[in-house]
């Protein structure tokens, strides 16, 4: 498991405005919790805690 930005297909983050949206998204994917990080490296994006290794995360490189 790891703490990371959860990713959609093609290495893109989930953009967000509310912590509740990210917490729901993260926990549905097996994480312990999550929140919406504002003005972070990838803008306003969901960050998950203890996300399982089989769930895609944002890695260096472009979002296609």
From Swiss-Prot:
Keywords: Disulfide bond, Ion channel impairing toxin, Neurotoxin, Secreted, Toxin, Voltage-gated sodium channel impairing toxin. Disulfide bonds join 12-63, 16-36, 22-46, 26-48. Residues 2-64 form the LCN-type CS-alpha/beta domain. One of its GO terms (cellular component) is extracellular region. It comes from the Eukaryota. Pfam families: Toxin_3. GO terms for biological process: defense response. Expressed by the venom gland. It is found in: Secreted. One of its GO terms (molecular function) is sodium channel inhibitor activity. InterPro entries: LCN-type_CS_alpha_beta_dom (IPR044062), Scorpion_toxin-like (IPR003614), Scorpion_toxin-like_sf (IPR036574), Scorpion_toxinL (IPR018218), Scorpion_toxinL/defensin (IPR002061). Alpha toxins bind voltage-independently at site-3 of sodium channels (Nav) and inhibit the inactivation of the activated channels, thereby blocking neuronal transmission. This contractive toxin is highly toxic both to mammals and insects. Belongs to the long (4 C-C) scorpion toxin superfamily. Sodium channel inhibitor family. Alpha subfamily. Has the structural arrangement of an alpha-helix connected to antiparallel beta-sheets by disulfide bonds (CS-alpha/beta). This is Alpha-insect toxin Lqq3. It comes from Leiurus quinquestriatus quinquestriatus (Egyptian scorpion).
């Amino acid at each position: 498991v790891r703490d990371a930005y959860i990713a959609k297909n093609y290495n893109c983050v989930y953009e967000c405005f509310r912590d509740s949206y990210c917490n729901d998204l993260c926990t549905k994917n097996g994480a312990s919790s999550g929140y919406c990080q504002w003005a972070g490296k990838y803008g306003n994006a969901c960050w998950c805690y203890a996300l399982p290794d089989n769930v895609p995360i944002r890695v260096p490189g472009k979002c296609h």
